[in-house]
Each structure stands twice: as C-alpha cells, then as structure tokens.
Amino acid sequence: CFILGGGMVTDLGGLAASSFKRGIAYINVPTTLLAMVDASVGGKTGINFNGLKNEIGVFAPAACVLLETEFLRSLDAHNFFSGYAEMLKHGLISTPEHLAELLAFDTEKIDYALLKSMVGRSVQVKERIVEEDPLEHGIRKALNLGHTVGLAFESLALAERRPVLHGY
C-alpha cells in the first residue's frame, strides 16, 4: 500500500492501513515539506473527531518512507513555511550548528539541493528521538514543542470553520 500526499493524507492512510485486516504494511510518499519532516516519520496517525485535532489515532509506523524533494518545487510559500517552521523546531532541539544552518537558509531563493540535505537532517533528528521513545512517554515529547498550544488554536480554528496549517 502506497500513501502519496501531504500530512493529512499520510495520517489518514496510515490509520486506514493500521485498521485494514488488523494492519497492513504501508509506504509513505510525503509530498509537502511538513509531511516529509513531521507526519511521515514516527508512526503517529490520527484524524480529527468531534471538532478536536487527532482525537482518533494509533502508532503505526510506515514500513518505508520515500522522500522525493522534487515535490517541494510545487509548494506555495504558505505550505513551504509550514514545514520550515517544523524544521526550525528540530534545529532548536538538535545542535547549534543544525539550527544555524536552518537560520542561514535563503527562503527567498530556495536552493533545492541544500533543502534536500536539510530535510534529510531534520528527518534524522526526528528518527533519533522516535527510536529512543516510540510511544511518546519521555524525550519524544520534545517534538511537541509548540503543538500543545498549537493544537488548541487549530481546534478553535476548525470549530470556526477556518482551518490553519499545522506547522505554524
């Protein structure tokens, strides 16, 4: 089973794959920057329910994640910065050098070769934390930096039928 799309699609697809026949293997092919550095790694899948974010979900890691950064050339600025914000968070919880590289990145004139390596590094940061704490009982909570408050804003925006992007 291949799941091709942004974070909403990979979340829904991962949840469906984990439920179908009590779980089938799936391969994530994320197409947005946020999906590449966040939703595609770690196996947290979920859907909104009753006006609340990610109320129904499971931990169901993909058997494989295929990252093709050529998809990123099609992103508008809004979607690019949604994912870039997540990468900055990874820089904050990683090394000063990683954060400096992210902060020095020219978002006005995107170097896609450099972005590809930065995506890889961001994914490695998340993978390292997820491997240490797969079910989010300890260090993995660092990945939620901003999410706790952010989810409250997202839920409010959903209730008012004015959804916002997850990465901001």
What does each model-identified segment do?
Residues C1-I3, A25:
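Glycine-rich phosphate-binding loops that contact phosphosugars or nucleotide phosphates
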Residues L4-G6, L145-G146:
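Glycine-rich beta-strand-to-loop/alpha-helix junction loops that act as flexible
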Residues M8-L15, M36, L151-A152:
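Short glycine/serine/threonine-rich phosphate/pyrophosphate-binding segments
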Residues M8-V9, V29, V41, I47, ...:
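Hydrophobic aliphatic residue packing
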Residues G14-T107:
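A glycine/threonine-rich phosphate-anchoring loop and its flanking beta-alpha core
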Residues F105-Y168:
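Active-site segments that bind and position negatively charged phosphate/pyrophosphate groups
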